[in-house]
Amino acid sequence: MAAPTLGRLVLTHLLVALFGMGSWAAVNGIWVELPVVVKDLPEGWSLPSYLSVVVALGNLGLLVVTLWRQLAPGKGEQVPIQVVQVLSVVGTALLAPLWHHVAPVAGQLHSVAFLTLALVLAMACCTSNVTFLPFLSHLPPPFLRSFFLGQGLSALLPCVLALVQGVGRLECPPAPTNGTSGPPLDFPERFPASTFFWALTALLVTSAAAFRGLLLLLPSLPSVTTGGSGPELQLGSPGAEEEEKEEEEALPLQEPPSQAAGTIPGPDPEAHQLFSAHGAFLLGLMAFTSAVTNGVLPSVQSFSCLPYGRLAYHLAVVLGSAANPLACFLAMGVLCRSLAGLVGLSLLGMLFGAYLMALAILSPCPPLVGTTAGVVLVVLSWVLCLCVFSYVKVAASSLLHGGGRPALLAAGVAIQVGSLLGAGAMFPPTSIYHVFQSRKDCVDPCGP
């Protein structure tokens, strides 16, 4: 079979990236819109704690997927993926008109509509890791990196949209008596939360359309079979086959020779290698990086950044979200296949993470507060920390690709388990024991 054209390959990478964009865009969008919705919802700034619990409950979606695989074995991931996408689109579309509706629960008003729809979206997003990733086992490893690039966009684009909206803008006017800062003045957003959720719905519709386009291209994609017993499609030229074989030979989870030559057979007879030392280490590494980037560090981001000002906080959020796509681009060009190298990068990421955790513990008066150097250091630390850990996660998942569908399914589970453990570990110190102290706007607690 002739090698696919450059245009078709570029289109496929684009569709895979847009497909990955829909994985966590809904929940990420809710998080970045919290500063707007808390003004009108009865929970106020306790809403993030409620939302953390709701997102954790979203892991119940994994049980639904497990039940589906038991009742419909061999049906693949297409149906669960489409269900996830429909739930995401419908959930965000309903948020637009209903997010501000409240109802009495146990004698107190609560955001019943907002939290219920957030639970639906959390279940869809949590389920995406164990449905989207196994689907990509039908494609060569470079497309997996495009998927993680899109997953990074699922965090970046809602952040950019929130910045355009003008979330969190305030001014500290001087008090007329003693010249100190008076009460903060909040600027109104450029458009309401309903418009934000409609824009988020449009992003998810685009992602769902990209998946449909991917299915239409599937018979022409390299290394993809249209059916379990159908003919296998070759990568193309002998040179491409040799290059793919060299790449697969470097993987710690080795595939059969037929896959290394550029074909994807039905079941993977070497899936047991997932339980080798290499496979277990890579899965543990993915769980650890997910715990840090999806659970531990997000819980303390406001404590580490807000003492340096709203600008530092917004720069850390947006540029930190951009670090994920940047790491994916880097992995496309330079992929670390050495376990020792991945360990070294993880230690480097832990160094940045330890600095950020120290800033959060020392809040509201961390070192270099009120200086430009402090702002630069905290923003740079967030960007480098997330970039390093994102690269490690992409590299580990690319190496796990050699184990086929079972390995990518296990990778998705590792991501979810790590994220859940990280969030669960940080909930008591942040929401129950209040170990971290926040800094109030327009108040200087560090003065003489």
From Swiss-Prot:
Keywords: Cell membrane, Glycoprotein, Host cell receptor for virus entry, Membrane, Receptor, Transmembrane, Transmembrane helix, Transport. Its main location: membrane. The chain crosses the membrane at residues 14-34, 47-67, 79-99, 124-144, 147-167, 191-211, 280-300, 315-335, 342-362, 369-389, 407-427. One of its GO terms (molecular function) is virus receptor activity. It comes from the Eukaryota. Residues 225-267 are annotated as: Disordered. GO terms for cellular component: plasma membrane. It is a multi-pass membrane protein. Glycans are attached at residue 178. Pfam families: SLC52_ribofla_tr (PF06237). The activity is strongly inhibited by riboflavin analogs, such as lumiflavin. Weakly inhibited by flavin adenine dinucleotide (FAD). It catalyses: riboflavin(in) = riboflavin(out). Widely expressed. Highly expressed in the testis, placenta and small intestine. Expressed at lower level in other tissues. It is found in: Cell membrane. The keyword Heme does not apply. Changing residue 70 to R: Riboflavin transport is unaffected. Residues 240-250 have a biased composition (Acidic residues). GO terms for biological process: riboflavin metabolic process; riboflavin transport. Plasma membrane transporter mediating the uptake by cells of the water soluble vitamin B2/riboflavin that plays a key role in biochemical oxidation-reduction reactions of the carbohydrate, lipid, and amino acid metabolism. Humans are unable to synthesize vitamin B2/riboflavin and must obtain it via intestinal absorption. (Microbial infection) May function as a cell receptor to retroviral envelopes similar to the porcine endogenous retrovirus (PERV-A). It is linked to Riboflavin deficiency: A disorder caused by a primary defect in riboflavin metabolism, or by dietary riboflavin deficiency. Riboflavin deficiency during pregnancy results in hypoglycemia, metabolic acidosis, dicarboxylic aciduria and elevated plasma acylcarnitine levels in the newborn. Treatment with oral riboflavin results in complete resolution of the clinical and biochemical findings. Belongs to the riboflavin transporter family. This is Solute carrier family 52, riboflavin transporter, member 1.
